[in-house]
Every structure is written in C-alpha cells, then in structure tokens.
Amino acid sequence: MARFGLPALLCTLAVLCAALLAAEPKSKSCSEVRRLYVSKGFNKNDAPTHEINGDHLKICPQGYTCCSQEMEEKYSLQSKDDFKSVVSEQCNHLQAIFASRYKKFDEFFKELLENAEKSLNDMFVKTYGRLYMQNSELFKDLFGELKRYYVAGSVNLEEMLSDFWARLLERMFRLVNSQYHFTDEYLECVSKYTEQLKPFGDVPRKLKLQVTRAFVAARTFAQGLAVARDVVSKVSVVSPTAQCAEALLKMLYCSHCQGLVSVKPCYNYCSNIMRGCLANQGDLEFEWNNFIDAMLMVAERLEGPFNIESVMDPIDVKISDAIMNMQENSVQVSQKVFQGCGPPKPLPAGRISRSISEGAFSARFRPYHPEERPTTAAGTSLDRLVTDVKEKLKQAKKFWSSLPSNVCSDGRMAAGNGNEDDCWDGKGKSRYLFAVTGNGLANQGNNPEVQVDTSKPDILILRQIMALRVMTSKMKNAYNGNDVDFFDISDESSGEGSGSGCEYQQCPLELEHNATEPSGKSANDQAGSAGGLVRARPSLLAAFCILLLVMQREWR
C-alpha cells in the first residue's frame, strides 16, 4: 500500500489542479474592454489589463470585473451623453422639418403679398394713370395693413377692410362730383349710405369674407408650424434623473465590465428604460396628436375655400371691378346721396374748371393682361407646399409614443428585436423576461428598470402641453373661419382679431370654437355699448374731481 501512496497523492493533486483551473474564467484579459475605453478618449491608466475584484463598483454587478471605480464614473457620464445624443437626433430631425416648412410658408406668404401689391400697382398705373398715382397711398396702406396682420396679428381685418372701402368711397365720390365742395361732415354722411347704396357692388362684402378667412388660415397655419418647431426644440433637451442615469449606465456599459463588449442590450430591456427616462415626454402624446389633427384640418382649408393664393392673385381685378361699378353707377349713387345728405355746395366757376381738369375721373376699365405674373422664391404653389406639409404632419403623429422604440431601434442603444436570447439584460447575457410598460408618467409605477416619481410631472413638459392645447383651439377657430387672438412668435401680444363666420362654407357642428365676436349683440350694438362706456368715464372723472375740490375746501 505504501508503494502506491506517492503516485496516488500526485494523481490526486493533478486532478485538483485541473478542477481549479477549470473553475477559473477562460480569459482574465481586459484588453478589448481597455481598447474600447481608450477609443472613447478616456485615460488608459483607468482601465486594468486583467480582471480585478469589483467590490468598489456602485451600479454595475460586483465580482471580478474589468472596470475600475474611475471607469464606472466615466461610463456613467458617457451613458448620459449617449442617451441625450440619440434622443436629440430623433427630435432634431422632426424639429428641422417643421423649421424648414415654416420658413418656406413664411417666405411664400410674404412674397405673395409683395407680388399682389406689385401686380395691382402695375395694373392701376396702366389703367388709371395719374389718377391712381395721386391716390396710391390708399392702396399702399391696404397692403401694409395686410402685411402687418400676417407678421404681428395686431390688425382687425374686418375693420381695416371697411376703413379701406370707406376711404376709397370718399376719394371716388369727390372725383365723380368734382364740381362740388364736400366738407368732412358731408363725407361722413355719405359713408352712412354705403351699405344701403352698395356703390362698389358686392365686391367689398365678398372680398372681406375671402380675405379674412384666407389670412386667418394662412397665419394660423404658419404659427402652428412655428409652435411645433419650438415644442420639439424645447423637449429635445433631456436631463436624466439620478434613477434614469443609473439605469442607462447599467444598460449601456455594465456589460463591458464583464468583458461582454460585443453583447448589446435586449430591445425590451432598452424599451423599459426609455419609457422610464422619457416618461414625461410620453405625456405630450395626447395633445400632440390633437394638434396634428387640427393642423391637417386647416391644411384642407388652405387647399380649398381659404386658399390665400386664389384670393390675393386676382385682388387687383376685384378692386378695379369695384371702382368701375362705382363709376358706372355714380349718377344714381350721387342723386340718392344728395337726397339724403342734402345738396352740396358748388365750387366757384374758376375752381370748377381747374378741378375738372386736375382730377375728373374719366378712366375706363381696360382688361389688363400682364406678360407674366411674378413667382415666389419658393418656386411652387400653395397647393404643393400644403401637400408636402400634410405628408410630414401625418408622419409626425404619434411621435412621442414612438420615441422610446425609435431610440432603442438605434443600433448604438440596443440589439434588434430578432436577437432576444443573446443580449444583455442588465445582469448578464440572457433573455429579457420582463414585460414592457406603457408610455407616459402614469404607467411607470411598475417599471422594473427605472424608479419614476409619478407624482411630479415635468414643468417644461406641462408648458408645452399647454402651448399645444392653446394652438389647437386657435386652429379650430381658423378652420371655422373665425379670427383668433395671438401671441406672436416673438412673444409679443397681438391685437384682437375679427370674426368672419362661415357664411359660404358650412362649418362642422362637432367642432366647438370660441368666436371672438360675442353672440347676442350686433356689431352696432357692441359699438354703441363701447361708446357709451367711453362717454361715461369722463363724466365720472369730472364728478370725482368736483368731489375732491369740495373736500379740499372743507379741509381748509
């Protein structure tokens, strides 16, 4: 037995050594982990060449590891940067779409106004000559106010157009009755007969309706594109919470610490983390989709009855038709005005001949066919612009609910859907077993990867939700032909708008809206009430002053 003792002992030791060697990891080298770490710009001295004890790790699994404490800290910062970068890329693409479309629309509308003004000027110079030149500021003011409305919104379109026709009637009435002298009081009386006599035919009423609806829709649509651009821009800047940052580190780089540099996070694992980290962004979904639907409705109006291009292109001909109507009916109009306002005073004989030679209205309408209408720099029609934007709007719908999935679909963030068995689940190379939670803050209570405080919504997100809600309301008003009150893009408040209603276009009953003009009182009633209030204030002030004087005397 003794002679077999030494060989048996040696065999036993050999078996034990083999077992111990088999129990150790196949590779203790951290060379690949170190190489990738250095490739990100970090100091190679932070990375060990071989596995070390991982008791120092705070987030990543402890045990033997290729990560030092410095590596874990830097990976934590890197994971947040990676997350911000991918989210920003997703949002920046959408933001760029809205920014470029807003720019195109803005340029198109502004140049459309410039071209319409140029066309009217060219036509009226050829048609009316010196007579137009002497009164051209009237038309410059018209286009100036239209531009001001589009840019700032601080114009009541209906009042502005009514004022234009009143001023034009004043000029026309003087011209067709140049042998008379008219005082300002007399011309004020003339204006009272405007509605009754309709000196310009039906053009003012139709043009007021068309211009108001078209400009409201155009400006609201452009403002909507700007709001969408700004909302996406503000929300694209994400700041991960401490809990989100831990989950990101665990997902993106803790696998490196175990030497699994080529193993990507499981798709569903990534989805849960993104839903937790982007919980507040998910709450934008409802109002965002409502906003997109409202934009699409206004786009349909721009393609149809509210097409600003079809309104502005022939505006010169329409105004000229109105002028010709006034000229052709000038005798009847003048007689009725003289009956209602009394006979005007004739000018002295010398002044009559001079007045007739200087300003008599004798121009007749001649069809004007310009060789070529000016084209906009956008190089396309409104219809094509709207069609393009409609397509982009449809693609943008459900953007926020799709954002977590889109982020995880990026190859830098997770493995593909088809690689569910050989992926990183936060602990090792395995299959991810947890179900994916829903979108939005309220659904994160049971998120297995990220602790989310569902009681504290993000203030910035709440503000963007409110901005979308307000803009959606304005879109519905514009869709129904009603002007809306705006805060300009530059956050300067705009003036009140005017309500035009849907006289010629039936408005869907299901769209609730708040017109700016209250029901129950006519415009005249409202004007009378406002005037009474203004007149009442000076009398109250006077009474107050008298009371102060009496009290002052008593004090003395």
Say what each PLM segment does.
Residues L21-F361, P374-L382, K397, P404:
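Extended alpha-helical scaffold/tether regions of large eukaryotic proteins
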Residues A2-K80, V87, F286-R556:
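Eukaryotic terminal intrinsically disordered regions
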